[in-house]
């Protein structure tokens, strides 16, 4: 495998399904907080394409993070069988269900470097609480300290995304069609997505606040790259105290409120129009029903009169016969 830096990691849906199945089979039954496995895929320049995976027996001590076990004999046997099926898929890294980094991840990553020099760690959250991607990719790098102390291993975040081939897209669409709730409207879905998005934004802001507090108290070293990126984010924020911004915000809010007010008026007029039409239709129906009843009464009355006239004529004929 070429010794190239990773710029992006593409995870296929098959990997996500395999990891969730692994966690449901082992994590819940064995009361394990996380499960570990191996990622298979290929390199395309600086993009890592993770197309397959398999589980690996793993155990660790809850109290001591330095005590852990990963069955590399099982790993080698499984990889040998996978290689017979598809020789293009190679070991490109490993995964665990996190949901965050652990202290012993560096040591596990060093073990995985025996099979893959540029081993990539992908944390897959099987129980996501916020709306967004359930994957986080990392690669180990040497961190140089400003105080002259020896370098140390640390993880650097890598951009990750979900990608699929045509066959996988068809399968995912089929699964989503089966579990999709057709009773939920598009408006409620949009509102739900916005609420989840705001919750995700709130959690990210809390993480930034926690990081800055730890840096300020000296619990974490200063990372100038992170500080510069946060400064860029703050520079992009609008100045809410600026008079022009306040005026523009009020104008836009008023315009939106006018649209909502007009929409409410239109709905009221349409509802009133429908009510009037319904009342007219009911009145016409009652009038038509009354006319039909009167016509039926007249027909019955005429029939009775005809019957009486017929009886009288019959009686007269009989009287004439008797006289003769």
Curated annotation (Swiss-Prot):
Residue ranges, annotated region (Disordered): 281-324
Sequence positions bearing N6-acetyllysine: 204, 214, 316-317
All copies of domain MPN, residue ranges: 9-144
InterPro entries referenced in this protein's UniProt entry, alphabetically: EIF3F/CSN6-like_C, JAMM/MPN+_dom, MPN, MPN_RPN7_8
A cellular component term, taken from the record's GO annotations: secretory granule lumen
Note: Does not bind a metal ion.
Recorded family membership: Belongs to the peptidase M67A family.
Protein name: 26S proteasome non-ATPase regulatory subunit 7
Gene that produces this protein: PSMD7
């Amino acid at each position: 495998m070429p010794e190239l830096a990773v710029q992006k990691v593409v995870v296929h849906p098959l990997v996500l399904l395999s990891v969730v199945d692994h966690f449901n089979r082992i994590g819940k039954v064995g009361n394990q907080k996380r499960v570990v496995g191996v990622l298979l895929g290929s390199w395309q320049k600086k993009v890592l394409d993770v197309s397959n995976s398999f589980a690996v027996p793993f155990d660790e001590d809850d109290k001591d993070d330095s005590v852990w076990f990963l069955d590399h004999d099982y790993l080698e046997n499984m990889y040998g069988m996978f290689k017979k099926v598809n020789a293009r898929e190679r070991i490109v890294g490993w995964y665990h269900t996190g949901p965050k980094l652990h202290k012993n991840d560096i040591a596990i990553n060093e073990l995985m470097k025996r099979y893959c020099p540029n081993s990539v760690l992908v944390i897959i959250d099987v129980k996501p609480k916020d709306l967004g991607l359930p994957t986080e990719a990392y690669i180990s790098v040497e961190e140089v300290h400003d105080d002259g102390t020896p370098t140390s291993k640390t993880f650097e975040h890598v951009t990750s995304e979900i990608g699929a081939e045509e066959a996988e897209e068809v399968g995912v669409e089929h699964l989503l069609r089966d579990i999709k709730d057709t009773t939920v409207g598009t408006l409620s879905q949009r509102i739900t997505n916005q609420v989840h998005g705001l919750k995700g934004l709130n959690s990210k802001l809390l993480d930034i606040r926690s990081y800055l507090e730890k840096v300020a108290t000296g619990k974490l070293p200063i990372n100038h790259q992170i500080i510069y990126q946060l400064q860029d984010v703050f520079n992009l924020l609008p100045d809410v105290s600026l008079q022009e911004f306040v005026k523009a915000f009020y104008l836009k809010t008023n315009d939106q409120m006018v649209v909502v007010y007009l929409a409410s008026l239109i709905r009221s007029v349409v509802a009133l129009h429908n009510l009037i039409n319904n009342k007219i239709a009911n009145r016409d129906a009652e009038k038509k029903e009354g006319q039909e009843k009167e016509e039926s009464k007249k027909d019955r009355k005429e029939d009775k009169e005809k019957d009486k006239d017929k009886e009288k004529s019959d009686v007269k004929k009989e009287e004439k016969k008797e006289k003769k």
